[in-house]
Amino acid sequence: MRLTRYFLPILKETPKEAEIASHRLMLRAGMLRQEAAGIYAWLPLGFRVLKKIERIVREEQNRAGAIELLMPTLQLADLWRESGRYDAYGPEMLRIADRHKRELLYGPTNEEMITEIFRSYVKSYRNLPLNLYHIQWKFRDEQRPRFGVMRGREFLMKDAYSFDLDEAAARLSYNKMFVAYLRTFARMGLKAIPMRAETGPIGGDLSHEFIVLAETGESGVFCNKDVLDLPVPGEDVDYDSDLTPIIKQWTELYAATEDVHDAARYETEVPAEKRVNTRGIEVGQIFYFGTKYSDSMKALVVGPDGVEKPVHSGSYGVGVSRLVGAIIEACHDENGIKWPEAVAPFTVAILNLKQGASDTDAACEKLYRALTANGVDVLYDDTDQRPGGKFATADLIGIPWQILIGPKGLAEGKVEIKCRADGSRELMSPEDALARFGAKA
């Protein structure tokens, strides 16, 4: 993509309403625009990151055996009355009515609707286990939306829902999602720690929040620092095998949110030098809630003994849009964002340091065409901005690799590659630069 043809509304000044780094940088980098309190338009650069994150989430859900569908944003109020949550959910739920006075709501979550879909089609244990997921926009009418996408009113979520014959089988489904979440966040360059958590309005008696440690987080957390060094399962993980050893490794060390923190146990189990008491950002949460919804909504299947019984369920959420902010909170410096390569809007930025000069124009054009032809996401800064301005823009928007092309280097047959993550620089030939990114001239 040529920057002269791209829509990238960079802000020179930091908006006054931005309180934390991710909000400031997303606004300054032209990633989003606030349209109302807690409601944002995703501009092209931000939308590219959102789609990269969504792709990783989808790949790991599919790998774990979940099946994608898509449910509507609007739901019937009567479904929520069946479960008993319509009145209990509170003012965060946006309640609306259509022209026929039918009561609807803008879904903050989807347990009722997925249970209604399940009970309409699945009648036998032979169709279990089943895990269905979707990625959809949601709305919660937060009393005080703040911190940009970290606590917005409209947000993109991945929700998965598992259905099993009994608790033992449901725990296996829970374990699969536990491992899938470890892999999902690791692929995005995040260290997300699973921590025991409260179940809240979802219900049930088992839940883990996946927390990225950050001083700007809204959750108080307590853990053994050894949990920060645990290995994440690799691509070869077999979801049909016994995942208990992995789960045990991650859950036997103390890690809990402040809502369920046990101070006595913490002091007993965790040596003083290994205690971590900080704040964190919740990027995902998983729940096992048994028959909470299948009981009230009559989601029954016939078991092997011929007797009908309510299914056991769990739900598994990932805050897709919140992850954009969480990654920035974990990956930035005073100059801007430092995107992990897997979620970066572009992999490479080509900076023409003397736009209009025939030699630099030709070299940039050749590299740009070769890289894009080989499937590399490239942003080519072909503007007439001064070099200092180009450096500032590239650092602000956080492209992982910058290729700097100027007349002095070209005279020696060299271009310069800068790594945004650590600031390191290296001179090499244009051909070697192409090879660095798996491309050929």
Curated annotation (Swiss-Prot):
Pfam families: HGTP_anticodon, tRNA-synt_2b
Location in the cell: Cytoplasm
Record's subunit section: Homodimer.
Family indicated by similarity: Belongs to the class-II aminoacyl-tRNA synthetase family. ProS type 2 subfamily.
Keyword Transmembrane helix: no
Lineage of producing organism: Bacteria, Pseudomonadati, Pseudomonadota, Alphaproteobacteria, Hyphomicrobiales
Sample GO molecular function, one term: proline-tRNA ligase activity
Record carries keyword Transmembrane: no
SUPFAM superfamilies linked: Class II aaRS ABD-related, Class II aaRS and biotin synthetases
Name recorded for this polypeptide: Proline--tRNA ligase
Principal EC category: ligase
Biological process terms in GO annotation: prolyl-tRNA aminoacylation
Originating organism: Afipia carboxidovorans (strain ATCC 49405 / DSM 1227 / KCTC 32145 / OM5) (Oligotropha carboxidovorans)
The organism's place on the tree of life at top rank: Bacteria
Reaction equations catalysed: tRNA(Pro) + L-proline + ATP = L-prolyl-tRNA(Pro) + AMP + diphosphate
Assigned GO CC terms: cytosol
